[in-house]
């Protein structure tokens, strides 16, 4: 994914405000062997790019003054109530150095899972992304979570996922966290419990 930026020579609160008033967003690219570089980007193009999932979890071709660098989006600051991007940070990446990136999960076959189709349950997304470690070339845009065989009451854990080659998940605390589950809606579960309580054993 290509991102076009321009070098920025002035900095400070006043300069950033004037930049935003002219339809630009201030930013910085850092990391690697090169010095940090102040940049500016077209606000509208950046605004639309931020709406794309891939912009947050893939290696970007960041072009600055005609020179392209591989980079990751690391942070961005939004105005508290206006549709305005105040600042954006990019980090250079090296082909030989592993990176840590949060990758979104795509839940597959939810409608056809037995627990949904036959058991009338609901799929619960316990987590929606995972932090992964990999080389830039191995970074996936997303990780598929296939819930197609799940029943009501079943929980899918990290070890149940098929990870792309070269990708490992970075866990914090729980080494095998729950990813998804299928359960009955609250009303249905209560009704089922009520029916069970109302039953009397046969004489």
Swiss-Prot record:
What does the organism's lineage look like at the top? Bacteria, Pseudomonadati, Pseudomonadota, Betaproteobacteria, Burkholderiales
Q: Name one GO molecular function term.
A: 5S rRNA binding
Which BP terms in the Gene Ontology apply to this protein?
Answer: translation
Pfam families, A to Z? Ribosomal_L25p, Ribosomal_TL5_C
Q: Which UniProt keywords apply?
A: Ribonucleoprotein, Ribosomal protein, RNA-binding, rRNA-binding
Q: Domain of life of the organism in this record?
A: Bacteria
The record's listing under InterPro entries reads: Rbsml_bL25/Gln-tRNA_synth_N, Ribosomal_bL25/Gln-tRNA_synth, Ribosomal_bL25_b-dom, Ribosomal_bL25_C, Ribosomal_bL25_long, Ribosomal_bL25_short, Ribosomal_L25_dom, Ribosomal_uL5_bac-type
State how it assembles.
Part of the 50S ribosomal subunit; part of the 5S rRNA/L5/L18/L25 subcomplex. Contacts the 5S rRNA. Binds to the 5S rRNA independently of L5 and L18.
PANTHER family, per database record: RIBOSOMAL PROTEIN L25/GLN-TRNA SYNTHETASE, ANTI-CODON-BINDING DOMAIN-CONTAINING PROTEIN, RIBOSOMAL PROTEIN L25_GLN-TRNA SYNTHETASE, ANTI-CODON-BINDING DOMAIN-CONTAINING PROTEIN
Q: Which Gene3D superfamilies match?
A: Ribosomal protein L25, beta domain (2.170.120.20), Ribosomal Protein L25, Chain P (2.40.240.10)
Q: Which organism is it from?
A: Cupriavidus pinatubonensis (strain JMP 134 / LMG 1197) (Cupriavidus necator (strain JMP 134))
The task this protein performs is described as: This is one of the proteins that binds to the 5S RNA in the ribosome where it forms part of the central protuberance.
Q: Which residues cross the membrane?
A: none
For this chain, the family text in UniProt reads:
Belongs to the bacterial ribosomal protein bL25 family. CTC subfamily.
What's the protein called, per UniProt? Answer: Large ribosomal subunit protein bL25
Kindly list the GO CC terms recorded for this protein: cytosolic large ribosomal subunit
Q: Is Ribosomal protein among this UniProt entry's keywords?
A: yes
């Amino acid at each position: 994914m290509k991102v076009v930026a321009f070098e920025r020579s002035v900095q400070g609160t006043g300069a950033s405000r004037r930049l935003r008033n002219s339809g630009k967003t201030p930013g910085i690219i850092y990391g690697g062997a090169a010095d940090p570089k102040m940049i500016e980007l077209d606000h509208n193009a950046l605004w639309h790019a931020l709406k794309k999932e891939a912009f947050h979890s893939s290696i970007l071709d960041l072009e600055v003054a005609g020179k392209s660098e591989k980079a990751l989006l690391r942070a961005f600051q939004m105005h508290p109530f206006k549709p305005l991007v105040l600042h954006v940070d990019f980090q250079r990446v090296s082909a030989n150095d592993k990176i840590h990136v949060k990758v979104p999960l795509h839940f597959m076959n939810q409608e056809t899972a037995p627990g949904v189709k036959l058991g009338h349950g609901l799929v619960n997304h316990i987590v929606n992304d995972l932090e992964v470690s990999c080389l830039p070339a191995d970074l996936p845009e997303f990780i598929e979570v296939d819930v197609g065989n799940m029943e009501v009451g079943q929980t899918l854990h990290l070890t149940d996922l098929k990870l792309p080659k070269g990708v490992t998940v970075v866990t914090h605390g729980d080494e095998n966290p729950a990813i998804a589950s299928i359960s009955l809606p609250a009303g249905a579960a209560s009704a089922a419990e009520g029916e069970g309580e109302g039953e009397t054993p046969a004489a």
